[in-house]
Amino acid sequence: MKKFFTVAILAGSVLSTAHGSLLNLKAMVEAVTGRSAILSFVGYGCYCGLGGRGQPKDEVDWCCHAHDCCYQELFDQGCHPYVDHYDHTIENNTEIVCSDLNKTECDKQTCMCDKNMVLCLMNQTYREEYRGFLNVYCQGPTPNCSIYEPPPEEVTCSHQSPAPPAPP
């Protein structure tokens, strides 16, 4: 429980001073789920909040794992998703629109990572028993982020046949 309060205070101070994606994500989570982003999701399961390890505890935790993987991909591309600011709107507390005004590819992709996470959360059951979950109980193999990558067949256009392999 002590870890939860430390993380909540840290997240609260980061979110209150950030001018980027973390504030955008907080606004999205709260508008769409009706829950406090900090009190309900920081420290939920094994992946919601900072870091993560082990097997995700439930569907909400899987949403957070996927979001961590999405951010890792952005870091690998040289983006700074915790602080990259993007423009978005939320319509009817359910529809998130990433604005065409977003200037950089990093801004656009960060918005999409956050949007996909919040849409994922919207369709899952929140379990109080995983709020403030101690990571000492996060055991088992850590799922590889490659599980979220589309198979090669989905990358090609549907109206084109894949190129035949080159002869040896």
From Swiss-Prot:
Glycans are attached at residues 92, 102, 123, 144. It is an enzyme of class 3 (hydrolase). It comes from the Eukaryota. It catalyses: a 1,2-diacyl-sn-glycero-3-phosphocholine + H2O = a 1-acyl-sn-glycero-3-phosphocholine + a fatty acid + H(+); 1-hexadecanoyl-2-(9Z-octadecenoyl)-sn-glycero-3-phospho-(1'-sn-glycerol) + H2O = 1-hexadecanoyl-sn-glycero-3-phospho-(1'-sn-glycerol) + (9Z)-octadecenoate + H(+); 1-hexadecanoyl-2-(9Z,12Z-octadecadienoyl)-sn-glycero-3-phosphoethanolamine + H2O = 1-hexadecanoyl-sn-glycero-3-phosphoethanolamine + (9Z,12Z)-octadecadienoate + H(+); 1-hexadecanoyl-2-(5Z,8Z,11Z,14Z-eicosatetraenoyl)-sn-glycero-3-phosphoethanolamine + H2O = 1-hexadecanoyl-sn-glycero-3-phosphoethanolamine + (5Z,8Z,11Z,14Z)-eicosatetraenoate + H(+). Keywords: Calcium, Cell membrane, Disulfide bond, Glycoprotein, Hydrolase, Immunity, Innate immunity, Lipid degradation, Lipid metabolism, Membrane, Metal-binding, Secreted, Signal. GO terms for cellular component: cytosol; extracellular region; plasma membrane. Residues 139-168 are annotated as: Required for localization on the plasma membrane. The keyword Calcium applies. Residues 1-20 form the signal peptide. It holds the Pfam family Phospholip_A2_1. Ca(2+) binds at residues 47, 49, 51, 68. Gene3D superfamilies: Phospholipase A2 domain. Expressed at high levels in placenta, testis, thymus and at lower levels in heart, kidney, liver and prostate. Highly expressed in rheumatoid arthritic tissues, including synovial lining cells in the intima, capillary endothelial cells and plasma cells. Binds 1 Ca(2+) ion per subunit. Disulfide bonds join 46-138, 48-64, 63-120, 69-145, 70-113, 79-106, 98-111. Its EC number is 3.1.1.4. PANTHER family: GROUP IIF SECRETORY PHOSPHOLIPASE A2 (PTHR11716:SF8), PHOSPHOLIPASE A2 FAMILY MEMBER (PTHR11716). Belongs to the phospholipase A2 family. Secretory calcium-dependent phospholipase A2 that primarily targets extracellular phospholipids. Hydrolyzes the ester bond of the fatty acyl group attached at the sn-2 position of phospholipids (phospholipase A2 activity), the catalytic efficiency decreasing in the following order: phosphatidylglycerols > phosphatidylethanolamines > phosphatidylcholines > phosphatidylserines. May play a role in lipid mediator production in inflammatory conditions, by providing arachidonic acid to downstream cyclooxygenases and lipoxygenases. This is Group IIF secretory phospholipase A2. It comes from Homo sapiens. The lineage of its organism: Eukaryota, Metazoa, Chordata, Craniata, Vertebrata.
